[in-house]
Regions:
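Short beta->alpha connector loops
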Residues: 80-83, 143-144, 166-168
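NAD(P)+-binding Rossmann beta1-loop-alpha1 motif at the extreme N-terminus of oxidoreductases
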Residues: 1-49
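General beta-strand structural signal in soluble alpha/beta enzymes
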Residues: 62, 136-140, 185-187
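Active-site-lining helix/loop region of Rossmann-like oxidoreductase modules
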Residues: 158-226
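Phosphate-coordination loops involved in phosphoryl transfer and adenosine-cofactor binding
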Residues: 2-5, 97, 157
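Rossmann-like NAD(P)-binding element
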Residues: 54, 59, 63-99, 106-111
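Rossmann-fold NAD(P)-binding glycine/threonine-rich loop
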Residues: 104-147, 151-152
Length: 226
């Protein structure tokens, strides 16, 4: 397994923190990023305390967004839609030549169970257009519920659709998904992120209808190796 330095921007939240925790357990160096370094350090300390319960060394660090992104080779964006562009703009100079994994979902409260894609069709595709092809933007994790991510003994029962224009970057993210204990599925170019972003609202509607916390998706009919 190739080891990465992963900056999780928005790692103080439920999804980002859960991903950070599982990647750290898998042996990656993880840096929590936040607008305020103090919040990032506090979140890192909390996550390291959880790792200690599993006899894993405290390997999660915390820093301001720009510093975290500068130190990483893979940057993961897990901020709310309203903060997406501002966060990307803040760290733009630190992203050149790197893989940016964007988990943004264009949810517009209060109707989060209704699909409301932006005018351009995809929030993540808009970030690729903003950054240019010098940054390898990959869309992933929109269909993964944060509900059980911090419970390291809980198996997350879903696949992860991975979209991006750069195939090697997609391969990197599919491998990182596997390190979480999940299956990553190559789902085409960044334009297809519109479909994965829309799925989140569909899954929220399913959760509400069936009174469950973490409905997910499975892709069937693939070769066993996939």
């Amino acid at each position: 397994m190739q080891k990465h330095t992963i900056a999780v921007l928005g790692g103080t939240g439920a999804e980002g923190g859960g991903l950070a925790l599982r990647w750290a357990r898998a042996g990656h160096r993880v840096i929590i990023g936040s607008r305020a370094k103090e919040r990032a350090l506090a979140a890192a300390a909390e996550l390291n305390a959880l790792l200690a319960k599993w006899d894993v060394a405290p390997v999660i660090e915390g820093d301001a967004n720009a510093a975290a992104a500068a130190a990483a080779d893979v940057v993961v964006l897990t901020v709310p839609y309203a903060a997406q562009v501002a966060t990307v703009t803040e760290v733009k100079d630190q992203l050149a030549g790197k893989v940016l994994v964007d988990a943004t979902v264009p949810l517009v409260p209060p109707k989060v169970s209704v699909v409301q894609l932006p005018a351009g069709g995809s929030a993540v595709a808009a970030v690729q257009a903003l950054l240019g092809e010098g940054v390898k933007v990959v869309s992933a994790f929109q269909s993964v519920s944060a509900h059980h991510l911090r419970e390291l003994d809980h198996e997350i029962d879903c696949d992860v659709l991975v979209c991006g224009n750069d195939v090697p970057a997609r391969e990197t993210v599919v491998a990182l998904v596997a390190d979480l204990g999940l299956r990553g599925i190559h789902a085409g170019t960044i334009a297809n992120s519109a479909a994965t972003e829309a799925l989140t609202s569909v899954l929220i509607a399913i959760n509400r209808r069936y009174k469950v916390p973490s409905a997910g998706i499975r892709i069937t009919g693939l070769p066993a190796a996939e």
